[in-house]
Amino acid sequence: ACEMCISKKTIYKYFSNKDILIEESIQMVHKEIHETIDKIVAKNFNAIEENFEIKRTFREMFKSAESSPIYQLKKHYPEVYAKALSSQIEICEKCFRDNIQKGINEGLYRENLDVDNYIKFYYTLIFNINENTASGIEAEELEVKALEYHIRAMATLAGIIELEKHLNNPII
């Protein structure tokens, strides 16, 4: 309430209890994430460029890890965080699946991929980095390495060339 410069009384005028407030907040964050991904996909980048653009955008959205809603949720409401994480995994799985299919269609990713396992590998890497890394800078570096690892594992020669182009761009 302090950070938003409104009183708790005002907040509870609109939300009958803290659980409902938290649930509504989570839904709002999920909606924002979904809309952000949709906007990036609508720009029609190639699959690899799309991955880097999503990475860049989310870095900006959550650049202050300690003030991010996800960090606060994990710290103060671990049960609600676990539920929110499960929902977020579903959103990410669809995003990853669509991106892999797009990359295959563009000839940037190999055709004979075990898509389900590649999705599981990548989100396991990303979520574990964020769960187990204390430093935001270290997490950022590991996320870029995980993205590189993920793309290299799937890429054709054309995909590797596109990947190298983005890795050599310092604005990841």
List where the protein language model places each region.
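C-terminal peripheral helix-coil segments that are non-catalytic and often amphipathic
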Residues: D98, K102, E106, S135-I172
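Hydrophobic alpha-helical connector segments
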Residues: E24, E35-A65, I119-Y122
